[in-house]
Amino acid sequence: MSITVEEFKKEISLGIPSELPELPQYDESVNHAPKRKEILSDSEKKLAVRNALRYFDPKDHKFLAKEFSEELEKYGRIYMYRLMPRYKITARSIEDFPHKSKQAAAIMLMLSNNLDHAVAQHPHELITYGGNGAVFQNWAQYRLTMKYLSEMTDEQTLVLYSGHPMGIYPSHKDAPRVVVTNGMMIPNYSKPDDWERFNALGVTQYGQMTAGSFMYIGPQGIVHGTTITVMNAIRMIQNSENENRSKLFVTSGLGGMSGAQPKASVIAGCVGVVAEINPKAVKTRYSQKWVDEVFEDLDLLIPRIKKAVENKEAVSIAYQGNIVDLWERLAADNIKVDIGSDQTSLHNPWAGGYYPVGISFEESQKMMAEEPERFKEEVQKTLRRHVAAVNKLADNGMYFFDYGNAFLLESSRAGADIMKNEKEFKYPSYVQDIMGPMCFDYGFGPFRWVCSSSRPEDLDKTDSIAAEILEEMVKDAPSEIKQQINDNLKWIKEAKKNNLVVGSQARILYADAEGRIKIAEAFNKAIKDGEISAPVILGRDHHDVSGTDSPYRETSNIYDGSRFTADMAIQNVIGDSFRGATWVSIHNGGGVGWGEVMNGGFGMVLDGSDDSDRRLKSMLFWDVNNGISRRSWARNEGAIFAIKRAMDANPNLKVTIPNLVDDEILNNL
């Protein structure tokens, strides 16, 4: 429904209206979340409805109680579809949002982007990506949060408990405008079924990473990381044989995050073949031109792959079907696959993150809700077949890596032949081999920004500024980080040509602390000078140097025994909050799954002021060097180099450096 800006502002200021809107018709054309596992007892179902009714006037309780009970029965959750706005949710210009605080308006823009139909995976269920990465639990929370943000000042802070707006509280100008927590659980109650139960009760949510922290920028965010990963994987195997052919990269997933893989394959210059079982996801990526070609028949796909490889094409091909069928056919036909991975949502294996082979998409969705134990058994059977086919191709020279989606972990739990020994997997995580030692240890990670004007010309200006900064930095950069800077310089120069924007006018760029600070300073000056027309919002993925403690992904290249600890992520969000972040977040889960990860992020609004300049220098320096310090203490060579360099540059930084012990001393014990 199209409305004027003034009508939009009025809608936001209403919050939860006293006269409730009509219940909308269920829209089958939208990609919906599957029905969630039925896990609540009869008394717990009543508690879930009681909890939901807290948002509403008692005069509406009788009919809403029946409606919410039916929603819970039909979908496994209470989404409050009745309150879903009729206006289009999108990253409008910052001035279109009603506000007393420009910082709060920027947050409204960012959370709106996460719910844009062009961006979100299941927009009507408030899921941005990953099958269960939620912005809010229900539409009442959305409406109330937007109302609070429109009313608050720079002397207040909004507190969000797993999507629930607890309230706005007195604070001060240097405090965050919003503090977000998602899925914070007593450690003993952080198993997957605990998420199912407590989310169904309406008391917690899984925010993934940038979903619940309002920092998702569409698949562009993961395109860059995937491009870097694939490029470096190609470099790792390049010397093994000098073939006059394209490299073949095979993987799965065309969802919110995994949908980046085909675009990244083309940018990296290889043949990318991506399997996806959900036809709506395939259609979305094909219509966005993130996939070049689509096949449903393996008999047609295999010859096309051979031709693309032989012709040295850089092309992305989607296989609409189950990834295991594809792997088994490639293995049976003895096709040489150079690089393999997986981006199914195995952090969420029993609720739509992974589909069993030999069972249709529709049958699987029905089974996961009605026969969850049988569904789990079928998934684990499929994982065993999946790994067997991968092993056969790996024996033939394929380099396979886990893309941080819990593939190795869930395969091991399924009893697949995935272990090298009792403690180690056969295959590395991409962080162990590539992202950790080449990027995170040196402080390089997914820095990003959004132009709050929503004008493409402002984004063009930021691209130009960032390129100029990197061109200067690379001249004097030490050899250890020249390649990282050059890769990102190439990326930013080609970003517009690669047509990466989906949703907000955003850009991602892997940079270290020095690069982030210099780029942010230059943006702030350009805003002050009127070269950029409106504030710029800085952020990053939680998947970064310091933001995430995740033993099977971000911290998988930590070998001092501390990879199962979470001090780094907690220290990071606390440190960001008092160094100038506009909003901060800390989440349970993200990437590998609920109970497996602790991760956090931030947002920072640059408005051209001296205050912004002061905050960005303090916060961005900490936000990167916290993680380098931890990685250095774990004896990671690149991190020791990076933190010593940081101390040389800033005399106020003093970090404890590890003393390295001679192996012979320990061997003689």
Predicted regions and their residues:
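Structural alpha-beta junctions
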Residues: E151-Q156, G269, K336-I339, K392-Y399, ...
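Short, charged/polar "capping" segments at the starts of alpha-helices
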Residues: A281-K283, E410, S546
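Intrinsically disordered, low-complexity regulatory segments
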Residues: I657, V661-L669
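N-terminal ligand-binding/catalytic initiation module
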Residues: M1-R235, S240-N242, M435-S585, V592-G593, ...
